[in-house]
């Protein structure tokens, strides 16, 4: 990892927890040592964004797990970047595979959300990744490059964007991409940014890995030169998330 890229660890709590259990988790995180050279962001369920921001130590930022592409309106069940900021959250996760595959979000919609969230001043954790059949068909690069292009077409300021590579076959399955598999895709993504955006953006943009990251797997993954951090699912609800936060130490 280049010295200029601050290690980034995101915890995606998904649709999990209640005030009591999340309060206990927050207590563990508040007591934890967060290295000065590591940025930590937690993404609670929408209902608990305000609760998390009030309870979490300021050293840990808060993200929403999704947002819509416009400011206000008749969009039942949706949340806008302005509302997310009003809660005190500063990031949003967009394009997660569960949004793509469970809720049918298209690349086009995700790109529109990215553009609006950035215009409203949020940082964006933009997710990309291939399914198992796509990896087995040898089209991993094609898939992730196409997804990245739609995101890139909607980004003016890359300093507010973190790219999260999440192979869909490794999310919640217990299967983790090997450090070599992760590094290979991250290196190719950085090459794509260099060729299609700029060398400066390629060098400065953090590309993080997600997919069954645990306290046991994080150190070797973190040692890869193009792995700049993690987006953690299930393990972010457990005390081992502290070990993952400290993976570079």
Curated annotation (Swiss-Prot):
Sites bearing 3'-nitrotyrosine, chain numbering: 68, 209
Covalent link (Glycyl lysine isopeptide (Lys-Gly) (interchain with G-Cter in SUMO1)) residue numbers: 142
Name this polypeptide is given: Triosephosphate isomerase
CDD domains, per the entry: TIM
Native source organism of the sequence: Pongo abelii (Sumatran orangutan)
Pfam families in UniProt: TIM (PF00121)
The protein's assembly and partners: Homodimer.
Active site residues of this protein: 96, 166
Biological process annotations from GO: gluconeogenesis; glyceraldehyde-3-phosphate biosynthetic process; glycerol catabolic process; glycolytic process; methylglyoxal biosynthetic process
């Amino acid at each position: 990892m280049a010295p200029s890229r601050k290690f980034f660890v995101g915890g995606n709590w998904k649709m999990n927890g209640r005030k009591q259990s999340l309060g206990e988790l927050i207590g563990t995180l508040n007591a934890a040592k967060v290295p000065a050279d590591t940025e930590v962001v937690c993404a609670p369920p929408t209902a608990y964004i305000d609760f998390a921001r009030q309870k979490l130590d300021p050293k840990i930022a808060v993200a929403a797990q999704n947002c819509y592409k416009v400011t206000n309106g008749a969009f039942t069940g949706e949340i806008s970047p302005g509302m997310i900021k009003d809660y005190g959250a500063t990031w949003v996760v967009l394009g997660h595979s569960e949004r793509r595959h469970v809720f049918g979000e298209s690349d086009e919609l995700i790109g529109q959300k990215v553009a609006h969230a950035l215009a409203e001043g949020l940082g964006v954790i933009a997710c990309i990744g291939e399914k198992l059949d796509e990896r087995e068909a040898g089209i991993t690069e094609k898939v992730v490059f196409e997804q990245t292009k739609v995101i890139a077409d909607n980004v003016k300021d890359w300093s507010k964007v973190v790219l999260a590579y999440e192979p869909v076959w490794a999310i919640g399955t217990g299967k983790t991409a090997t450090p070599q598999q992760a590094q290979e895709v991250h290196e190719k993504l950085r090459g794509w940014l260099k060729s299609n955006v700029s060398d400066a953006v390629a060098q400065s943009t953090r590309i993080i890995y997600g997919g069954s990251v645990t306290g046991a797997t994080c150190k070797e993954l973190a040692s890869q030169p193009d792995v700049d951090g993690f987006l953690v699912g299930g393990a972010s609800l457990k005390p081992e998330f502290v070990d993952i936060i400290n993976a570079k130490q």
